[in-house]
Amino acid sequence: MLKRASFVEVNTASLRHNFSAVKSIVPKDAHIMAVVKANAYGAGAIKASEIFLQEGANYLGVAALDEALELRSHFPKTPILILGYSPNANASMLIDNDLSAMVFSLEQAEVFSQMALKSQKRLKVHLKIDTGMHRLGLEPNFKSIETIKKIRALKGLEVEGIFTHLSNADAKIKTHAKNQMKAFNAFLEQLLDQKIEFQYRHAYNSAGILSLCNGNENRFLNLYRPGIMLYGFYPSNEMKESCPTILKNVISLKAQIVQIRSVKKGEFIGYGEHFYTNEETLVGVLALGYADGLMRALGNRIQVAINNQLAPLIGKVCMDQCFVKLNNIQAKEGDEVILFGDKSAKANDASEIAALLNTIPYETISTLSKRLERVYI
């Protein structure tokens, strides 16, 4: 890859540490699906997957076909599940690349089966059950049992898994999450009563792993799906404050100062007259902008770390560049700037940036552009 003056630094030791944290919580005989959608939440899907597989991951989880195909080109034998919706038009690519798909309707299952039979193959599928998130899935009721019987009878499919998704397991009060698991477990018991079993049964995301593995709600589960915790973040501030598990920061957004210029008093910096120089101002220009994932709204709102000093980000963030004020800062062209990342360097971490923008760290890191090089340390 061509070098740029901005990049995402990824701490591989932290990736390994966080995966080990998952292994220390889930049952010893459990399978682990490392969720690496959205370019591994910004960390780089190929390298992150390689590390998780080395550490013992049994499965990889993504959201869409393009993500799955990228992984398949590097990991020809690794099980890969597309957790999101797969259009019928994608069926042949799912089959040809030995990918597993999420299914939630008989109609789609029939299309997938027909396509698989034409290829003289079988497509692996996982059935999605909606236990209370009300997004996608079959309802956990008698009608769905009949639907599942019909899906399992389709000769072009291998129904290897069944799963649900917890919508609120990161809350302080776990009532909704426990009710979801109660519904899922009851449904699994009804299926077992009719001798319907699955190789994989899964429900716990990071929030479930961190907060619900000490009860018996997971008694039927044998596969766990860690996501955000692998990249060093807790699913919510409540969990961060109460959870004994230590997670380590993985991602830092960095850029070099490409030019330093002195701007006289009484000038505006950047687009739209959003920063006025009320004194002679030393301005450092960074080759990093909102097209790279540095939110435009952060201009005039955060401080960045330069040589263990804090300097304000000024003006509006441009598409490809931004500005820092260097008055009283020891810095030169080529010096490294940490926009967010490891707090040991005085920088904000992604959760603090997210709080400032009234969002979550998932968004802060997963929107980091692929045009930024990932540098692994």
UniProtKB/Swiss-Prot annotation:
PROSITE patterns: ALANINE_RACEMASE (PS00395). Keywords: Isomerase, Pyridoxal phosphate. Pathway: Amino-acid biosynthesis; D-alanine biosynthesis; D-alanine from L-alanine: step 1/1. InterPro entries: Ala_racemase (IPR000821), Ala_racemase/Decarboxylase_C (IPR009006), Ala_racemase_C (IPR011079), Ala_racemase_N (IPR001608), Ala_racemase_pyridoxalP-BS (IPR020622), PLP-binding_barrel (IPR029066). It catalyses: L-alanine = D-alanine. This is Alanine racemase. Substrate binds at residues 135, 319. It is an enzyme of class 5 (isomerase). The gene is alr. The active site is at 37 (proton acceptor), 271 (proton acceptor). The modification N6-(pyridoxal phosphate)lysine is found at residue 37. SUPFAM superfamilies: Alanine racemase C-terminal domain-like (SSF50621), PLP-binding barrel (SSF51419). One of its GO terms (cellular component) is cytosol. Catalyzes the interconversion of L-alanine and D-alanine. May also act on other amino acids.
